Amino acid sequence: MNPFHELEPGPEVPEVVYALIEIPKGSRNKYELDKKTGLLKLDRVLYSPFFYPVDYGIIPQTWYDDGDPFDIMVIMREPVYPLTIVEARPIGIMKMEDSGDKDWKVLAVPVEDPYFKDWKDIDDVPKAFLDEIAHFFQRYKELQGKTTTVEGWGNAEEAKKEILRAIELYKEKFGKKE
């Protein structure tokens, strides 16, 4: 099974999506789902002494402007194992450029954690935590000589619109799943 192509984008898109976790919170290893095989591949070990501040992955059957599946960050209290499917509620979007390409990332919370039941939009996330996430993504490629720019945060509605657009981009690239 290749989860990128065979999993649906979510049970109630765009209100609830599947986050296919590639990288657990706290990791310095950057894993990526191999789009051809569906296996997890070590892409690189971060050059910097940083670690991922959130669980990080993709939304299945999506494609984005950077030429990859649409990225999703899930705020969890405990790290999740790679290749875990998390039902996630989008609450915002980080507006970012990576080497000049639009590389926005959905920010979400797990549906099945009562701790986050009242987190519905970006304003529900403590600003200090948003700043930590932005700082990580602003700096994590610096020692590789690559440039990333975090331009700010969008709300849940903006995230949901981008999810729907990413699903359409997937259909254009790979064909509509029957």
UniProtKB/Swiss-Prot annotation:
Keywords: Cytoplasm, Hydrolase, Magnesium, Metal-binding. Pfam families: Pyrophosphatase (PF00719). Its EC number is 3.6.1.1. Substrate binds at residues 30, 44, 56, 140. The keyword Cytoplasm applies. Mg(2+) 2 binds at residue 71. One of its GO terms (molecular function) is inorganic diphosphate phosphatase activity. It catalyses: diphosphate + H2O = 2 phosphate + H(+). One of its GO terms (cellular component) is cytoplasm. Its cofactor is Mg(2+). Signal peptide: none annotated. It is found in: Cytoplasm. Mg(2+) 1 binds at residues 66, 71, 103. One of its GO terms (biological process) is phosphate-containing compound metabolic process. Belongs to the PPase family. Catalyzes the hydrolysis of inorganic pyrophosphate (PPi) forming two phosphate ions. This is Inorganic pyrophosphatase. The lineage of its organism: Archaea, Methanobacteriati, Methanobacteriota, Thermococci, Thermococcales.
